């Protein structure tokens, strides 16, 4: 798989969350001032999840945002088919990789709301095992998603997922054990327990940086 020129400009190949202006790793938590945002500011985290790890990441992002005194709502797109963006000042979209691509619910949501996402402050995060040591593939998944949806977010986070062996059925547990043996990054083939590779500090930096870029008076709410 090849990475698009647009994505190469956004990511520098390092593990983590990236600043599109300079394509450098953001390595510190920002000291945000809550007074920058109106009490009416509301952020949506819309996500697709298969085994629950992306949902946990979305909830963590929502908690970080709420800790700054801003309203945040995390919604599973599978259960929110007719979701309207009218009441939000910013949107973060997230999905995870299964069978080599992000969930169709996520792609459908982005395609349907692309014009709104391009007007509002928005960002995308991708959850995959590839983000734990195989950044070339992690970036390629996002490039493919961009090509599929036509959306080129100004901020992208690449987060490592989890191996939830105890949640898998016998066949999937067996297949995942075989797959991880061939993957870089030191993924565990120990099926007796689950293995979470998500860097929660990285997730917090992603949320903090999104808020740092959000200027309420410039947020273009979509009028019905």
Regions found by a protein language model. Give the residues of each.
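Extreme N-terminal basic, low-complexity initiation segments
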Residues: 2-10
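Residue-identity detector for glycine
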Residues: 9, 13-16, 28
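N-terminal beta1-alpha1-beta2 submodule of the flavodoxin-like/Rossmannoid cofactor-binding fold
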Residues: 18, 24, 30-120, 205-224
């Amino acid at each position: 798989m090849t990475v698009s020129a647009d994505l190469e400009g956004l990511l520098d190949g390092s593990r983590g969350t990236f600043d599109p202006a300079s394509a450098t790793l953001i390595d510190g938590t920002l000291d945000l001032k809550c007074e920058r945002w109106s009490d009416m500011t509301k952020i949506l985290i819309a996500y697709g999840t298969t085994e629950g790890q992306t949902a946990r990441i979305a909830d963590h992002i929502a908690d970080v945002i709420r800790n700054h005194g801003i309203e945040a709502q995390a919604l599973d797109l599978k259960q929110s088919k007719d979701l309207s963006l009218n009441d939000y000042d910013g949107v973060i979209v997230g999905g995870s990789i299964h069978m080599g691509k992000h969930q169709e619910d996520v792609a459908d949501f982005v395609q349907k709301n692309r014009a709104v996402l391009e007007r509002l402050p928005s960002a995308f995060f991708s959850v995959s095992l590839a983000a734990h040591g195989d950044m070339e593939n992690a970036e390629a998944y996002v490039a493919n998603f961009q090509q599929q949806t036509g959306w080129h977010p100004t901020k992208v986070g690449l987060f490592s997922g989890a191996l939830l062996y105890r949640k898998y059925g016998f066949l999937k547990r067996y297949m995942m054990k075989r797959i991880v043996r061939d993957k870089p990054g030191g993924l565990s083939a120990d099926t007796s327990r689950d293995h979470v590779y998500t860097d929660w500090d990285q997730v917090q930096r992603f949320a903090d940086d999104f808020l740092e870029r959000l200027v309420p008076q410039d947020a273009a709410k979509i009028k019905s």
